[in-house]
Regions:
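Short acidic-aromatic active-site loops that bind/stabilize oxyanions
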Residues: 15-20, 149, 153, 242, ...
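Conserved anion/nucleotide-ligand pocket segment
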Residues: 146-149, 154-194
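Thiamine diphosphate
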Residues: 1-139, 144-145, 161-162, 181
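Generic recognition of stable, solvent-exposed alpha-helical segments in well-folded globular domains
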Residues: 48, 155-158, 247, 251
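A short, charged/proline- and glycine-enriched loop
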Residues: 274-279
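Structured core elements
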Residues: 39, 177-179, 280
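Conformationally flexible catalytic loops at phosphate/diphosphate-handling active centers
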Residues: 176-270
Length: 280
């Protein structure tokens, strides 16, 4: 017990606590993850995360390529290709903006391109609705994207770090979308424990694309034309990678608890009144 108490005290001293929003928490995660390329285009309510990212860049706290695109389609195309070139990337959108990027969103998993994106959940403007709804994120449910919903600003920061760890694992190489309820989470403030850079570096290795790196010294073809037989094989490989995420996620959460001293229990879902359930 004394040894555990000493470990927890050391972890406490290595963290600082700040009153920030869910969007700010994601921006801080980008800083801690040392993201290389970030693209932005404004649409409520996700736009707040890019405002905070831009402040970090302007203040010299985050050294990255911060690119303001002309639309969501370009936004996701830029980070897709940057990731193929070995850059750690971040992007995001909300509602119909997420829909506008659908071509890039569809192609990214099939190319085995890891990225982390934030979805500031918002209704798809039907009929003129701007409140919280999850249909934006759910459009990529069957396309090979990992989907995560977070409840708090603390969970948003922690999950973003875990998302990079899982998405960039060579066994996975799939994108991950973190859903944050618009306004309720993106704009509301809460006390958040911000881990030290040293701890994050211990938890999160650098992104290594290895032989799949798109580089002049490694000329490879990205997205070659494939017939229907190869398309089915690509789908099979995507499914196999998604099946492997369960093991990689468990590893990531175990390491997260060991390094940061925080645990979320079951990493896949939260249980409520399920003790005697046969089907959930």
């Amino acid at each position: 017990m004394a040894q555990l108490a000493a470990v927890l005290e050391d972890q406490r001293k290595s963290e600082e606590t700040a009153l920030i929003t869910g969007s700010e928490a994601i921006a801080v995660a980008c800083k801690l993850a040392d993201v290389d390329v970030i693209t932005a285009y404004p649409i409520r309510p996700y736009d707040t995360v890019m405002q905070y990212v831009s402040k970090l860049v302007a203040n010299g706290e985050l050294d990255c390529e911060y690119i303001v695109a002309e639309g969501e389609h370009s936004q996701f195309e830029i980070v897709k290709h940057a990731s193929a070139c070995g850059a750690r990337v971040f992007c995001g959108s909300s509602g119909v903006g997420w829909m506008y990027a659908m071509e890039a969103l569809t192609v990214t998993p099939a190319l085995r391109i890891p990225m982390v994106a934030m979805v500031g959940n918002r209704a798809l403007d039907d009929p003129g609705a701007f409140g919280v709804e999850h249909n934006d994120a759910l459009t990529v449910r069957d396309l090979g994207w990992q989907l995560v919903w977070v409840d708090t600003a603390q969970e948003a920061l922690d999950t973003a770090l875990i998302a990079y760890r899982v998405a960039e694992d060579r066994r996975i190489f799939l994108p991950c979308a973190i859903s944050c309820d618009g306004a309720f989470l993106t704009h509301s403030q809460a006390l958040v424990k911000i881990p030290s850079q040293e701890k994050v570096n211990e938890f999160l290795p650098r992104y290594n694309r290895a032989d799949l790196l798109l580089h002049p010294d490694n000329p490879i073809t990205v997205a070659p034309q494939g017939n229907e037989d190869w398309v089915m094989e690509i789908r099979r490989q995507n499914y196999a990678a998604m099946e492997r995420t369960s093991e990689v996620i468990r590893e990531a959460y175990a390491d997260f608890e060991r390094i940061f001293g925080r645990s979320y229990g079951n990493p896949f879902f939260e249980e409520y009144e399920t003790e005697d359930a046969d089907v959930v």
